[in-house]
Amino acid sequence: MSIRRDYLLRMIEQAARMLARVRELLVAGKTAEARAELERAAREAGLDLGIVLSLTPESLLPLLTNAGETDRPKCALFAELLYLERQRAIADGDTARAQRCAERAHFLFTLAYEGTTVDEETQDKISELL
């Protein structure tokens, strides 16, 4: 296995662990900790959640491209982060933020999976955001 492939697999595993941890925190009602984890993960992936939410989709798009191509894995990661941030905002009663998260997550899921077959779990998330 190549070094690049090993690195990518480690990054995927790390992201999966982080998403699972955030879900656990949300189930436990630890929304402040979940928010901190989400914000940390977003920064480590190269963008601040606040920026992702405040920019228009058109302004955000250049930050989600690599060599002129949509960075689908990055879009998928940020869609998942915003999906979980939406759940956190709902739990905290912040309906305005939850709505912004839903709109932006839907946009990012669309960018990430446009023209591809989407697994059932992801399709359920996308449908929930509409």
Model-inferred region functions:
Residues D48, E85-R88, D92, L111-G115:
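Glycine-centered coil turns and helix-coil junctions that link the paired helices
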Residues M1-C75, E103, F107-L111, E128-L130:
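N-terminal alpha-helical interaction modules that lie
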Residues A15, V22, A79-Q87, G93, ...:
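Conserved small-residue packing positions in alpha-helical repeats and bundles
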Residues A34, A41, A79, R86-A89, ...:
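Small-side-chain structural scaffolding
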Residues V27-T31, A89-T95, V118:
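Short, solvent-exposed secondary-structure capping/transition elements
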